[in-house]
């Protein structure tokens, strides 16, 4: 008797041989196109396909955007996302996982874990402040607002680009690609905060053409090398202010030290808005 095919597993396995970066660069070029008919068609098709709510956008007219990426990274109205108390969600999305960091282990999906040390770029000293701390993973779906904000006020200490693959990020790959978030290309941003150390990890994914930060712009590191930038002059970003954005896709993993406790309302799969209170 034939064993039924697990479609999620098949979807994940099909991605291994794909030229992830080549595909992402190609999509990125299309997303930057300023050809009116092409960008207007792409934006309107995207809005229909993913049921994007434009009523909260600062610019609600799809044709007003110069290119698809400008639409995708659209700003919201100033009153669209009130900022709650304590530690807040850095983005709109789904709280896919949260909880304790057990020594070097974080939960990726039910029954699947990955390494804190690997996530942060393979430096044990960098990972040490977060051992036995806590973490939260927010997945941004295509229809979500794609700017990333500070969950608390923080002083930027270090930025680390970590090269990697660009598997798509969703429940199928979380369940079937071991160490997904520590395997994909990512940007690790380390902050000092009143709640202790904070690592904001912006994880790339298939067709994520670029990651930007407010202090460095688009991050374009040397290919294939871990690149570390330390900041001697303080860069302070207030709670609720933008710290970065995805030009298409992906996921934010927050790692904290020992002084953060999640609120009772938090559950795996909770849909959250940027600014929504998650922890104290």
From Swiss-Prot:
Protein name per Swiss-Prot or TrEMBL: Phosphatidylserine decarboxylase proenzyme
Species this protein is from: Chromohalobacter salexigens (strain ATCC BAA-138 / DSM 3043 / CIP 106854 / NCIMB 13768 / 1H11)
Subunit structure: Heterodimer of a large membrane-associated beta subunit and a small pyruvoyl-containing alpha subunit.
Cofactor notes: Binds 1 pyruvoyl group covalently per subunit.
Modification Pyruvic acid (Ser), positions: 250
Top-rank taxon: Bacteria
Similarity field: Belongs to the phosphatidylserine decarboxylase family. PSD-B subfamily. Prokaryotic type I sub-subfamily.
One Pfam short name: PS_Dcarbxylase
EC number per UniProt: 4.1.1.65
Gene: psd
PTM comment text: Is synthesized initially as an inactive proenzyme. Formation of the active enzyme involves a self-maturation process in which the active site pyruvoyl group is generated from an internal serine residue via an autocatalytic post-translational modification. Two non-identical subunits are generated from the proenzyme in this reaction, and the pyruvate is formed at the N-terminus of the alpha chain, which is derived from the carboxyl end of the proenzyme.
Active site residues according to the UniProt entry: 92 (charge relay system), 149 (charge relay system), 250 (charge relay system), 250 (schiff-base intermediate with substrate)
Record field: catalytic activity: a 1,2-diacyl-sn-glycero-3-phospho-L-serine + H(+) = a 1,2-diacyl-sn-glycero-3-phosphoethanolamine + CO2
Obligatory cofactor(s): pyruvate
GO terms, molecular function: phosphatidylserine decarboxylase activity
UniProt membrane topology term: Peripheral membrane protein
């Amino acid at each position: 008797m034939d064993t039924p095919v697990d479609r999620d597993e098949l979807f994940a396995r099909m991605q291994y041989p794909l030229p992830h970066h080549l595909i992402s660069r190609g999509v990125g070029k299309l997303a930057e196109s300023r050809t009116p008919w092409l960008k207007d068609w792409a934006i309107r098709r995207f809005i229909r396909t993913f049921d994007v709510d434009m009523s909260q956008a600062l610019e609600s007219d799809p044709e007003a955007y110069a290119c698809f990426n400008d639409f995708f990274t659209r700003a919201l109205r100033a009153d669209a996302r009130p900022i709650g108390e304590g530690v807040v969600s850095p983005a709109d999305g789904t709280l896919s996982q949260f909880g304790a960091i057990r020594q070097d282990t974080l939960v990726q999906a039910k029954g699947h874990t990955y390494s804190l040390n690997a996530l942060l770029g393979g430096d044990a000293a960098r990972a040490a402040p977060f051992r036995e701390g806590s973490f939260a993973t927010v997945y941004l779906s295509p229809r979500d607002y794609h700017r990333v904000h500070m969950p608390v006020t923080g002083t930027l200490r270090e930025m680390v680009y970590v090269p990697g693959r660009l598997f798509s990020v969703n429940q199928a790959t979380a369940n079937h690609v071991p160490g997904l978030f520590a395997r994909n290309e990512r940007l690790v941003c380390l902050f000092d905060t009143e709640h202790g150390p904070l690592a904001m990890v912006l994880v790339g994914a298939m067709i994520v053409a670029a990651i930007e930060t407010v202090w460095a712009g688009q991050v374009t590191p040397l290919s294939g090398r871990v690149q570390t930038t330390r900041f001697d002059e303080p860069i302070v970003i207030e709670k609720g202010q933008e710290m970065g954005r995805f030009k298409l896709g992906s996921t934010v993993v927050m790692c904290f030290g020992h002084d953060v406790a999640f609120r009772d309302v938090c559950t795996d799969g909770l849909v959250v808005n940027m600014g929504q209170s998650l922890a104290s």
